[in-house]
């Protein structure tokens, strides 16, 4: 048996800078990961199959177009018994499906002893799959295929992730964008020696999908506000196309206290403290 961890992907920034003739949007995003996520296990079997377990399993029925199965098919026609242990909310803006696909590729490449597919094949699975396969902090551009490592390591930081229990499909959010030619991030991203300096830079940047997502799901604004109100929260913003929002914290204790407080105030929300992985 082989196993791979599918970390949550967090867009600290997400600038929509254009749209190609084929309809794909051009992005400029600072992407990190959180030390919370799903797990994909792969065991030898004659046929390819998928079982979904975990606290979020009921929200993701097994279907032939599941990204885990699609990822498996890109590696060939061999068999395997796959188990997806689902902890991340579905359609939540933190790359759950893409991270699961990337984890499936890693687990199956080990099981079958084959190389990972080429970048073009990975990108066909979804715009976030290449960055999830990379699994470290990068600047993501193009339609998701241009990944540039950061010039300096990110500071130690903690995140609180909160989702109000609302699934937000990505296409309607992009369709509701007011404009698609927004300015990118600065050409040069300096190093950030402290979490405070990182938060200061992030405060000057954006998630261009946040306004249209809030228009479609007003609960996102309340989620962001709940995070921003917590002691020690340096910045609160939506990740991806929503509905998950993140709060940036310098200290583990403050992050854990914030997660507990929000979970108590909003028992129907999904809330998780996590170390930021860069």
Swiss-Prot record:
Pfam entry (one): GHMP_kinases_C
Keyword set includes Transcription: no
Kinase listed as a keyword: yes
GO aspect biological process, one term: isopentenyl diphosphate biosynthetic process, methylerythritol 4-phosphate pathway
Purpose of the protein: Catalyzes the phosphorylation of the position 2 hydroxy group of 4-diphosphocytidyl-2C-methyl-D-erythritol.
PANTHER family: 4-DIPHOSPHOCYTIDYL-2-C-METHYL-D-ERYTHRITOL KINASE, CHLOROPLASTIC (PTHR43527:SF2)
Stated name of the protein: 4-diphosphocytidyl-2-C-methyl-D-erythritol kinase
UniProt gene name: ispE
